UniProtKB/Swiss-Prot annotation:
Co-factor binding comment: Binds 1 potassium ion per subunit.
Listed name of the protein: tRNA modification GTPase MnmE
InterPro entries: G_TrmE, GTP-bd, GTP-bd_TrmE_N, GTPase_MnmE, MnmE_dom2, MnmE_helical, P-loop_NTPase, Small_GTP-bd
Family in the record: Belongs to the TRAFAC class TrmE-Era-EngA-EngB-Septin-like GTPase superfamily. TrmE GTPase family.
Species this protein is from: Pseudomonas putida (strain GB-1)
Cofactor(s) this protein cannot do without: K(+)
Residues annotated to bind Mg(2+): 230, 251
HAMAP family: GTPase_MnmE (MF_00379)
Enzyme Commission designation: 3.6.-.-
A GO CC annotation given for this chain: cytosol
Residues annotated to bind K(+): 226, 245, 247, 250
Role played: Exhibits a very high intrinsic GTPase hydrolysis rate. Involved in the addition of a carboxymethylaminomethyl (cmnm) group at the wobble position (U34) of certain tRNAs, forming tRNA-cmnm(5)s(2)U34.
Length: 456
């Protein structure tokens, strides 16, 4: 049997007790199930209050029944919602009644999956439903809602249309060689290609911010021993998460804390002090610290502002740049301002580098500057009209599309190879199609929708 034609049922409200609980059905039997359970023919899109009965006519509960005939429903199929009281026993009895009249229990995310398969929404919009439910901040919720409304998808479709137009031009020139179009001399191809690359770069940047808001930013605290890294972690965490002593090298391993700043998720990693050492255990800690630096979204390079090397803290940077090629993702923290007498504040250079001077021992002003800086790095300052949610798989697809465009441009400019450019354009279009589901394997769809709540 084609499972899409089966009628599915699930409890759509969260587990536990509440004033209202909802059982949702989708499929060809939804209308008949509503008639059998309520004892009446349901008028589409009208609220019907009355009893919900079992097969013997006994009342299971009282509530509201809503019937939405397809295709004008969330899933594109006939949909029935039974809104009763929110007790788990009552809802389970009602769900079993739905099974009794011919429904089967829905898989996690199957309602959203059917909406996708029936072209009611694309894959990015379907994922935004889960992101909206799981949002840990108002900004993340707004971004998810904009993705659900199609903002991210519109940007991807715009890129796809531009690629299609470019492919038509290139492939027409290849198929009709008598036109003798010189791609390089024409200049039109390069102009169109560079325009797509520029827009793709913008979407990549905005999607990266959206992914940080959704998944949280990994912040690694690094620096020399005894620079105050663990004290800074404790202040950010709001508790004594790390042992703090005056003995250099107290922290010898990775210490992770998951915190929220105004609802924004951050994964803060305290690391062993970076120095040459003969201590085998400490050496392992330093190696792990360098590995964590390479995987970080943001590195806080902490220096002791009273130490001699504080006058030239960037002497530490070669060690960091081996792991973190982008120095723009490193924030310099000049710690112990209470001892050095330096002014607490934030300084941003013309090249974008940020230095924050603070004291990790109770300096509220400096710590608030750091919190605000981290929020800005995550895109918290974006307005509700500019952001959208994104996932790591979206970033991978955008990266692949960008790489294909870069490769195709190189093939065109270095070898004048229009055929190779055409293939790279096709591959880039395919990568973008994976975001919206235009090109997606059944395995990918299964993994995505299985992570949803049952009833969604």
């Amino acid at each position: 049997m084609n499972t899409v034609r089966e009628t599915i049922a699930a409890i759509a409200t969260a587990q536990g007790r509440g004033g209202v609980g909802i059982v949702r059905l989708s499929g060809p039997l939804a209308g008949k199930a509503g008639q059998l359970i309520t004892g009446r023919t349901l008028t589409p899109r009208h609220a019907h209050y009355g009893p919900f009965r079992d097969d013997d006519g006994l009342v299971l509960d009282e509530g509201i029944a809503l019937f939405f005939p397809g295709p004008n429903s969330f899933t594109g199929e006939d949909v029935l919602e039974l809104q009763g009281h929110g007790g788990p026993v009552v809802l389970d009895m009602l769900l079993q009644r739905c099974v009794q009249v011919g429904c089967r229990l829905a898989r996690p995310g199957e309602f959203s999956e059917r909406a996708f398969l029936n072209d009611k929404l694309d894959l990015a919009q379907a994922e935004a439903i889960a992101d909206l439910i799981e949002a840990s901040s108002s900004q993340a919720a707004r971004n998810a809602l904009r993705s659900l409304q199609g903002e991210f998808s519109k940007r991807v479709h715009s890129l796809t249309e531009a690629l299609i137009a470019l492919r038509i031009y290139v492939e027409a020139a290849i198929d009709f060689p008598e036109e003798e179009i010189d791609f390089l001399a024409d200049g039109h191809v390069l102009s169109m290609l560079d325009a797509v690359r520029g827009e793709l770069s913008t979407v990549q940047r905005e999607a990266g911010q959206g992914a940080l808001l959704r998944d949280g930013m990994t912040v690694v605290i690094a620096g020399r021993p005894n620079a105050g890294k663990s004290s800074l972690l404790n202040q950010l965490a709001g508790r004594e998460a790390a042992i703090v002593t005056d003995i250099a090298g107290t922290t010898r391993d990775i210490l992770r804390e998951h915190i929220h700043i105004d609802g924004m998720p951050l994964h803060v990693v305290d690391t062993a002090g970076l120095r040459d050492t003969d201590d085998h255990v400490e050496k392992i800690g330093v190696e792990r610290a360098l590995k964590a630096i390479g995987e970080a979204d943001r590195v806080l390079l902490v220096v002791d502002s009273t130490a001699p090397e504080a006058s030239d803290p960037f002497a530490l940077w070669p060690e960091f740049l081996d792991q973190r090629p982008d120095p723009a993702k490193v924030t310099l923290i000049r710690n112990k301002a209470d001892l050095s007498g330096e002014h607490v504040g934030l300084e941003q250079c013309d090249d974008g580098h940020v230095t924050i001077t603070l004291s990790a021992k109770g300096d509220d002003t400096g710590l608030q500057l750091l919190r605000d800086h981290l929020k800005a790095c995550m895109g918290y300052e974006q307005t509700a009209e500019s952001g959208f949610s994104a996932r790591r798989r979206h970033l991978d697809a955008l990266r692949q599309a960008s790489e294909h465009l870069e490769h195709g441009r190189a093939q065109l400019t270095l070898a004048g190879a229009g055929e190779l450019l055409a293939e790279d354009l096709r591959q880039a279009q395919h990568a973008l199609g994976e975001i919206t589901g235009a090109f997606s394997s059944d395995d990918l769809l299964g993994r995505i929708f299985s992570s949803f709540c049952i009833g969604k």
